[in-house]
Every structure is written in structure tokens, then in C-alpha cells.
């Protein structure tokens, strides 16, 4: 089974959070809202990136050369 790998980038601390392993992009978007909406600061500081995929059959990662931007928290809660 293939899982998508996502992580939230915090532009204030200039770091990525713990990776999220999801079946669909919608789960990652929901995790972004649930995990970061109550944090102080600008919602635009938290951006969701797709990092690649994880194959559960052979436990292998296939990561993108560069993370692919999905959306920011501001786009989800304000738009």
C-alpha cells in the first residue's frame, strides 16, 4: 500500500514538523487544521508540503527532490 508523506513547515522556527503518513491529501489538510489552528501567530506561517511516498509492502521511501507545496493554514481557515 502506498502512503503519501507530508510535513508542516513553520516559517517562524524555520523547521518541518513530524511527518504525516496519509492515504489522501485531505487527511493531511485536516491534520494541519486540527494541529495548528489554535497556535498563536499568523496562519500563513504554517505551510503543508508533500515530501513523497512510502511503500508499506517493502518499507521504502520515495522522496521528491524538493518538497511540493500543498497549501497554508491561512488558505484553509480563511478561504
Where are each of the predicted segments found?
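Intrinsic-disorder/low-complexity peptide segments enriched for small residues
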Residues: 1, 22, 71-74
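Short, mixed-charge low-complexity intrinsically disordered segments
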Residues: 36-79
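Short aromatic-glycine-(Arg/Gly/Cys) micro-motifs in beta-strand/loop hairpins
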Residues: 1-15
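Eukaryotic short linear interaction motifs
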Residues: 15-16, 29, 57-58
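Charged, amphipathic alpha-helical segments
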Residues: 24-36
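Generic structural motif
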Residues: 11, 25, 53-54
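A short, exposed loop/beta-hairpin motif centered on an aromatic-Gly-Thr core
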Residues: 15-24
